[in-house]
Amino acid sequence: MADIKNLSPVEIWRNFDKLTQVPRPSGHLEKIQAYLLDWAKEAGVEAFQDAAGNIVMRKPATPGMENRKGVILQAHMDMVPQKAPESNHDFENDPIETIIDGDWVRANKTTLGSDDGLGVATIMAVMEAKDLQHGPVEGLITADEETGMFGANGLPEGELNGDILLNLDTEVWGEFVIGSAGGIDITATLDYKEVETDKEDAAVKVTLKGLKGGHSGIEINEGRANANKCMVRFVREAISELDARLASWQGGNMRNAIPFQAQVVLTLPKENVEALNDMVADWKDEICDEFNGIENIENIEFFTENVETPATEVPAEIQDNLVDAIYACHDGVLRMAPSMPGIVETSSNLAIIEIGGGKAAIKILARSSHEYYKMYLATMMESCFNMAGMKVEFSGAYGGWNPNPKSDILEHVLKVYKEQNGKDGVVQAVHAGLECSIILGKYPHLDVISFGPTLLSPHTANERCQISCVAPFWNLMKQLLSEIPAK
């Protein structure tokens, strides 16, 4: 494990190093919540945990700055638990193994947790610092952002006192975000009665892996391969041409991550197994050709394994309906933002497919900065899966964050950034969900901006943070806090 705690600025890296030692996958936050409360007590920082699982910290103003506007520093404590197929990492119990790789910090075949651990580490650095000049400061460290923004959604009104919100969950240094997409979770389910497999049939497990995957918002515009969408094209052809039957399907594991791996078990007449192997080889060539220049095609694996024939499989009519619905389901960019060239407005991610044992579940995350188009896309999905006889439910909906280009904090941040870096910052809206929109719904008076150091490939085992961005990010934070105006 690389010793990252001595990297500069030590104030942030020391705290991030501590966070890597505490397991904090979404949905399993007891250890990190306890750690943050213990840390705050030891540091002499006022802190408490609210009913939604958020940790709130408070630090009084530097003497003489009590009349300044209050600043809320906000980040989320949970991390996406993704790992390479060969990794045995246990996210609920194991620390993250960090590696210094040139100008980057990464993990050993797992997500790093810099999303949003660096934001949390920055809050800790501000809270414990003795030499910073600032007005009243609060830290809001939210729970389970990655799986539905549950902490932000459960944030009580009246809990926070500040006037300005600095969200620390943007992943390109020098970009200052003033708008983000809304989102909605779509879940289609079906219970079915399995049928007996033909005892004379063979069974083959087909695996597709080695795709990049990635963040289903930030990286959806790159046209990366979705393992579920690639797999359904093969499965439909195998059913049509080789009399194959679907026994099970497992693809993807996070709504907000583009699936990089999918696996199906098919049964088919023994005399067709060789043809199936040839078909898989042909589809591998096709995928590599289609995604050459987008995917690392040398990493793509598409292969078969002979397995014991399962006792049951999906009934033919239900199988055909499911496969057709998955095939027809939209995935990727639906529309670009008309008013912001190069920015995705509306997209969806066919994230998780689980079929087998008499149950089918398909999970999708749709995003849009346009509320009407978000619901249009969600209803499109509902119609698609209703035709397959599935029950469709919407959950976890949150609105977009509408940009305010005349924001006072935006003007202030851009001024400080240019003074320190000698160039203009880039004002952006992002095609990803930020908690800002939800918090603004509860605290509409807040002046909000989001920024942070550069991270690459969040939500994947290739996640990494650029070391050289963290020092200028910290310098901006220190000057910004010292110059917050009076109320």
Regions found by a protein language model. Name each.
Residues 3-103:
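Acidic/His- and Gly-rich active-site-bordering loop/insert found
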Residues 4, 8-12, 338-341, 345-360, ...:
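Zn-dependent metallopeptidase/amidohydrolase metal-coordination segment
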Residues 65-147, 152-163, 189, 203, ...:
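Active-site metal-coordination/substrate-binding segment of hydrolases
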Residues 255-263, 309-317, 402-415, 438-442:
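Short glycine/threonine-rich loop-to-helix capping motif typified by GTGT followed
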Residues 158, 223-241, 268-273, 320-327, ...:
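His/Asp/Glu-rich mid-to-C-terminal helical/loop segments that flank catalytic regions of hydrolases
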Residues 343-432:
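Substrate-recognition/cap regions that form aromatic- and gly/pro-loop-enriched pockets
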Residues 219, 226-229, 233-249, 403-446:
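Active-site-adjacent substrate-binding region
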Residues 23, 103-106, 146-147, 153-367:
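Midchain, well-structured core segments that form catalytic/ion-binding scaffolds
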